[in-house]
């Protein structure tokens, strides 16, 4: 386990229809938790109350079928705060799908001679597959942007330039400032301008589906907005698919070059 103060923290803010993504069956939940173990997936956990963020992993699902064990760390101060928490909000990714669940009353224990926390298996788990299309993380070296027109109270329109951090045939995720920007679930923005490297700018209409709060290692907070394309023209869809294919082809070529 490591302190998350110097890493990126992700807090789920809102989604359009959580019920669609909530799992309640203990077998399904345990399968996903086992997947986190098998993939050695890092988990961002946050204490409630207290908002102490740290990185951890699921290390075991005991045979009792009712408990989960997560990794603790060498910092006794953090471990004490975690052990005194009412619950932990845990967030991770598995197969590029965001996973979130709560652990109630984590209790300090030991597992394989290491400090750990034991808690009841969560009664529900959020498996947030925001879009049913393959999502591509955009290269940092070739920025994809989207200019979003924001109506102002005085009747003017402010065009906000956002950085696209992932893209698919179904939508995009963009980073927006956390304050003074009217972004909320189900809001729609027309006449947005999506700019793809080497392919130019295409007009799109976006609908906000969910929001996450991001905190980078420098303490700067931003919002990650997952947006769905609305009535995407075929020509725009073709351009997006060409872009995704090109980026994947280039990545594969680089990987082959390292072998």
Curated annotation (Swiss-Prot):
Q: Which GO terms describe its molecular function?
A: cyclic-di-GMP binding
Principal localization reads other
Task: Give the subcellular location.
Answer: Bacterial flagellum basal body
Keyword terms, alphabetized: Bacterial flagellum, c-di-GMP, Nucleotide-binding
For biological process, the GO terms are: bacterial-type flagellum-dependent cell motility; regulation of bacterial-type flagellum-dependent cell motility by regulation of motor speed
The UniProt entry, under InterPro entries, shows:
PilZ_domain, Split_barrel_FMN-bd, T3SS_YcgR, T3SS_YcgR_PilZN
**Residue ranges constituting the PilZ domain according to the UniProt record:** 129-246
**Key word Zinc present in the record?**
no
The record's GO CC annotations read: bacterial-type flagellum basal body
Q: Does the keyword Kinase apply?
A: no
Pfam families noted in UniProt: PilZ, PilZN
Any idea what job this protein has? Answer: Acts as a flagellar brake, regulating swimming and swarming in a bis-(3'-5') cyclic diguanylic acid (c-di-GMP)-dependent manner. Binds 1 c-di-GMP dimer per subunit. Increasing levels of c-di-GMP lead to decreased motility.
Can you state the subunit structure given in the record?
A: Monomer. Interacts with the flagellar basal bodies.
Q: Which family does it belong to?
A: Belongs to the YcgR family.
Q: What is this protein called?
A: Flagellar brake protein YcgR
Organism equals Azoarcus sp. (strain BH72)
């Amino acid at each position: 386990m490591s302190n998350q103060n110097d890493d990126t923290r992700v807090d789920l803010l809102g989604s359009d229809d959580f019920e669609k993504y909530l799992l309640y069956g203990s077998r399904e939940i345990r399968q996903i938790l086992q997947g986190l173990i098998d993939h050695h997936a890092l988990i961002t956990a946050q204490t409630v109350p207290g908002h102490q963020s740290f990185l951890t992993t699921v290390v075991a699902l005991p045979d009792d079928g009712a408990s989960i064990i997560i990794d603790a760390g060498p910092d006794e101060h953090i471990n004490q705060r975690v052990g005194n928490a009412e619950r932990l909000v845990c967030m991770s990714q598995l197969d590029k799908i965001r996973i979130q669940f709560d652990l109630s009353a984590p209790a300090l224990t030991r597992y394989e001679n290491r400090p750990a926390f034991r808690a009841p298996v969560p009664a529900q788990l959020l498996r947030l597959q925001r879009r049913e299309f393959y999502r591509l993380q955009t290269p940092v070296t070739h920025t994809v942007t989207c200019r979003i027109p924001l109506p102002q109270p005085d009747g003017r329109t402010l065009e906000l330039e956002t950085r696209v951090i992932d893209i698919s045939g179904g939508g995009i995720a963009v980073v927006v400032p956390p304050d003074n920007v009217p972004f909320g679930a189900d809001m729609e923005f027309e006449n947005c301008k999506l700019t793809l490297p080497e392919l130019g700018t295409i007009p799109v209409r976006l609908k906000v589906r969910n929001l996450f709060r991001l905190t980078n290692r420098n303490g700067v907070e931003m919002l990650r907005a997952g947006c769905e394309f609305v009535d995407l023209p075929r020509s725009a869809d073709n351009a997006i698919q060409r872009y995704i294919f090109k980026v994947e082809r280039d990545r594969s070529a680089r990987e082959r070059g390292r072998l």
